[in-house]
Amino acid sequence: MKYQQLENLESGWKWKYLVKKHREGELITRYIEASAAQAAVDDLLTLENEPVLVHAWIEQHMNPALMNRMKQTIRARRKRHFNAEHQHTRKKSIDLEFVVWQRLAGLAQRRGKTLSETIVQLIEDAEHKEKYASKMSSLKHDLQVLLGKE
């Protein structure tokens, strides 16, 4: 496992995930009967700051179909949490117009690289081009000086 699991922190994430799914109208409990489901949800809503009880609630009441999705969400959240600790792993976002994103995605796909790798490669190409142009300009100037054509 690459990232350490922090039970109390992740329990809070799980609680927030379940409450969000409930508010979005998803069935978060294993119960078909509405009153039993509502009683379980009401119980969950009181457990916000009780990590051990949230875990017990999940074991006892949660809809099994939701388990895999919740695990994936928590795994992604854990990764973002630990990556945010270091500048070099912290993710940033940029807004692109759809047409720009489409062209960039197409280029990345043709090159077999990620969007980030493609952007870095384009920046490096532009830097090399600038360096080459500067070097050529300098050589041209030096050649003109040698030939006495200032």
Curated annotation (Swiss-Prot):
Physiological role:
Required for spatial organization of the terminus region of the chromosome (Ter macrodomain) during the cell cycle. Prevents early segregation of duplicated Ter macrodomains during cell division. Binds specifically to matS, which is a 13 bp signature motif repeated within the Ter macrodomain.
Question: Which cell locations does it reside in?
Answer: Cytoplasm
GO molecular function terms noted in the UniProt entry: sequence-specific DNA binding
Q: Give the highest taxon in the source lineage.
A: Bacteria
Read off the lineage from the record: Bacteria, Pseudomonadati, Pseudomonadota, Gammaproteobacteria, Enterobacterales
Q: Which family does it belong to?
A: Belongs to the MatP family.
Per the record, the GO terms for biological process are: cell division; regulation of DNA-templated transcription
**Descriptive protein name:** Macrodomain Ter protein
Q: State a GO cellular component annotated for this protein.
A: cytoplasm
Q: Which UniProt keywords apply?
A: Cell cycle, Cell division, Cytoplasm, DNA-binding
Q: Which gene encodes it?
A: matP
Establish whether keyword Cell cycle is in the entry. yes
Among the Pfam families in the record, one is MatP_C
Record text on subunit structure and interactions: Homodimer.
